Structure formats: structure tokens, C-alpha cells
Amino acid sequence: MLVAALLCALCCGLLAASARAGYSEDRCSWRGSGLTQEPGSVGQLTLDCTEGAIEWLYPAGALRLTLGGSDPGTRPSIVCLRPTRPFAGAQVFAERMAGNLELLLAEGQGLAGGRCMRWGPRERRALFLQATPHRDISRRVAAFQFELHEDQRAEMSPQAQGFGVDGACRPCSDAELLLTACTSDFVIHGTIHGVVHDMELQESVITVVATRVIRQTLPLFQEGSSEGRGQASVRTLLRCGVRPGPGSFLFMGWSRFGEAWLGCAPRFQEFSRVYSAALAAHLNPCEVALD
């Protein structure tokens, strides 16, 4: 029994040492291999930064990843994940209250877009990476970027939870338009100058000309250009089929990994109608300066 206990402790120590060896110097990222991990074991990782990357080669067993240090914050926070290559060999879940798990990245997910979710106050910022079983030993890599930031908003719009996931091309309802206008990182009244399609990333890049910057929390549009208008790129899924067209729109969305991602883009007159009706009925969640 003593020998078995010593062997078990030695194995656990080797697993912990192997995990520690994969950290980057600033402990913001980790790279390691499942070939050194015992089947059925769970490696423990802690990354101290709010931005970083994970690369898990030949996934085996599972990893538990704590983000932003070991202490949970007192404010809600949003975590976003994006594959850095076709995601293979594992699934990524977010830990929720009472030990529940929420799927964020599934095996086979391509490079297009990613997924975000919101942790409440005092929820531990932890991800659970679980290897998926395969009969062969071909090279598989589960690699993704992450970003974590505090969120002071009362609630998270459904459009903010996924950038490049199923439902991203669905038109926003009236209620979603109003909520997105209040919670998004940018609200821009403008026109479509052009659209470029990236076949490799399966994304469309929309060049937006701003008539008016209503709100932005990131330096997306630089006001005061020579023409008095700013241009910026906003991304969406290729399969959404965005094309250049006439008319003015209200572009609303979020900053993800330093890029602007589209949430809702109603025609400006349509949003004005929805907002005016909500204002008259005292149902507007916030004030939007359209004039």
C-alpha cells in the first residue's frame, strides 16, 4: 500500500511539473502535450493574465484552467474564446455554479468566429478542457485564444454571446435591437462602403463609413478625418451573405480580440421607428441619442 501511494504521489507530481513546464514566461499562455498525461487524469493550470492562448497537443484526459488568477472577482466578467486553428481532439466548457458545465468550443469547430459567456460575481473563472476519445493516434491540436474582462452591464445581449456562431445571421428582434443599442461596444450610424470576403477564415469584412458615432468603447472610428467622416472594418460570418447596398444603417456590435464584430445592423429608419415606439411606451432600456 505504501509503495502504491508513493507511486501515485510521484505520478501527480510529474503531471503538475509537466503542466508547469508549458507556461509562457509571463504565465499568460500555456503549451503542452497529452502524451505525458495519465488517461483519466485532470491537469491543473492557472493563467494570471486576462489575455492569452492555449495549445494542447495530442489531448488526453482533461485540463482545468483558471483564468485571471486564482481568486474570483467581485464583478461579473465575460470570457471569449476563439480557435487559432481548426479545433481537434477536445471540447472546452466553462464552469458554472453548482459544478455545471457550459459548452464553449466543440471538436471540429473551424476558425470562423468564437464564443463568449458571462460569469456572475464570485463565480470562479475556470474552463474545463476534456479530450475526446479517438481510436487512432494521429496528431490533433486543441488551440485557442482567450480574453477576459469585467462587465458592468446589467445583462448580456444574446448577440454578444457568439461572434461567428449559429444564429449570427438571424435578424435581430425589436427587443434585441433595443438591448444591443444599450449594451454593445459601438453604435454607429453609417453606410456600407464595401465588403471583402475572406474564404480562409470564412468571414466577411465590411468597410463602414460613419455618418455619426453615437457611442464606442474602443477606438474604432477616428472622427475628424479630412472628409469629416471615419471608416472602419466590421466583421461578420461569410455565410451571412453581406453585400454592399444603398441606404444608411445603425451598426452595433462588440470588440473581440481587437476586432469589431457585428451584432445587429438595422436600417436607420427601422431602428428609429422601434426606438420611438419603445420611448412612447416607456419601455426603452436606455436613451439613444439619434438626433
Swiss-Prot record:
GO terms for molecular function: hormone activity. Keywords: Developmental protein, Differentiation, Disulfide bond, Neurogenesis, Secreted, Signal. One of its GO terms (cellular component) is extracellular space. It is found in: Secreted. InterPro entries: Meteorin-like. Residues 1-21 form the signal peptide. Disulfide bonds join C28-C49, C80-C116, C169-C240, C172-C264, C182-C286. GO terms for biological process: axonogenesis; glial cell differentiation; positive regulation of axonogenesis; radial glial cell differentiation. The keyword rRNA processing does not apply. Belongs to the meteorin family. Involved in both glial cell differentiation and axonal network formation during neurogenesis. Promotes astrocyte differentiation and transforms cerebellar astrocytes into radial glia. Also induces axonal extension in small and intermediate neurons of sensory ganglia by activating nearby satellite glia. PANTHER family: METEORIN, METEORIN-LIKE PROTEIN. Monomer. This is Meteorin. The lineage of its organism: Eukaryota, Metazoa, Chordata, Craniata, Vertebrata.
